[in-house]
Amino acid sequence: PESTGTGRFGNWLENLNDWNLSRSRFWGTPLPIWRDDSQGEKCIGSVAELYSEIEKSVSAGIMKVNPLKERGFVVGDYSQDNYNKIDLHRPYVDDIILVNDEGKPMHRESDLIDVWFDSGSMPYAQLHYPFEGAINFNDDSAEIVKSENHISTEEEYRELLVNSSYKGTPLPPAFFPADFINEGVDQTRGWFFTLHAIATMVFDSVAFKNVISSGLVLDAKGNKMSKHVGNVIDPFQMIHQYGADPVRFYMMTNSEPWD
């Protein structure tokens, strides 16, 4: 509804503050930034780049071995078996020490990235874009595939444009931007925003065309249920007491379709 779209979400965007991406936690996605003592930085953009930088560190005598190579990781092999050989989370990634142009060691920034950045990156992460997931990513996939040298002949390029297929294989519809997404109204400052922010920064595009925004479950006094407040009802307890179908029917009949 307009009250959520141009209202709640629009007001959030109009009064937007800078997004602090770092989090001082252990579990999560490490920030791929290495710093030296002079505040020089290296931001790593792929596992292939990290592999290459570790090789430089080994050559400079900073690291003794390349742990990715030691585990048999093969750059360019995007199979699950290959990626199961390595773990780039803490504490393992913190043992990787890179080298700057002066031969000095560089240590990883200890913070993690906001988990909402992970959520907002979903359209790209699910396809491992822009690595092997470029072909059917978005409506401009033909240009992307051609620019990434996946297509070597004009015949293949024409096939992609005319038949939406690649080397005889039909391509699924474009994944980005999404036709619609669905989440609770509280995601105007969460998932809706992070999807929109990252898509704008990276592609100057919307991440979704339509939104179905559902309401929130309230308590007997009309307040939002919250684990922090302690006014929640355990659904499993209700299912155990009344059965799954009565609970499901109650939820359906007490929520208007437009809520």
Question: Predicted regions: what is each one?
Answer:
Residues P1-D259:
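Structured secondary-structure scaffolds
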